Every structure is written in C-alpha cells, then in structure tokens.
Curated annotation (Swiss-Prot):
This is Large ribosomal subunit protein bL28. PANTHER family: 39S RIBOSOMAL PROTEIN L28, MITOCHONDRIAL (PTHR13528), LARGE RIBOSOMAL SUBUNIT PROTEIN BL28M (PTHR13528:SF2). One of its GO terms (molecular function) is structural constituent of ribosome. GO terms for cellular component: cytosolic large ribosomal subunit. InterPro entries: Ribosomal_bL28 (IPR026569), Ribosomal_bL28/bL31-like_sf (IPR034704), Ribosomal_bL28_bact-type (IPR001383), Ribosomal_bL28_sf (IPR037147).
Amino acid sequence: MSRACELTGKAVMSGNNVSHANNKTRRRFLPNLCDVTLMSEALGQSYRLRVSANALRSVEHRGGLDAFLLKAKSNELSQRARLLKKQVAKKLTEQTEA
C-alpha cells in the first residue's frame, strides 16, 4: 500500500530537520492519510479509499464523492479512482438521457 492519496495524489516528500544550530538531518514528510469509506450517490455504493485529510475536506466542500471526481483532474487520481470517475460519469449521462 503506497503512502499516497488516491484522490489528490499527495505523496511522501523529503527535506531536512534544521536545528537551532543550523544542523541539517534528512527526514520524510508523510501525508496525513485516512482510510475512509465514501458513498457514491450516482452508483449507490460505498467505496473504501485511502485519502488525505485535505482531500476529505475537499470532498465534503464539493458536495460528495461524485462531484469531487467529476471535477478532479484524471492525472492526479489513482487507477481505482479513475475507474470510479468513469463509472460515475457514465451513470450520470445515462440518467440525464433517460
């Protein structure tokens, strides 16, 4: 399981701890990842995703998983999220046509 957000692509970064004496030691900055279950209204199913706390706030701000996925850039999404985005878009176009 990678340490990257499935919705925003946030991943591990590296940098330095810098002491008061300006000594630098390498460190890793880990994203704040949460295992959450999000509901898709269009598909009527819940999905388990590993997302950052920031992405979780963005999902709620945009009005749910479906709205977030439709507005998100595909290159930031994980493979699973891209597939989910495609399914949601297909389902919504079917509903608007009917």
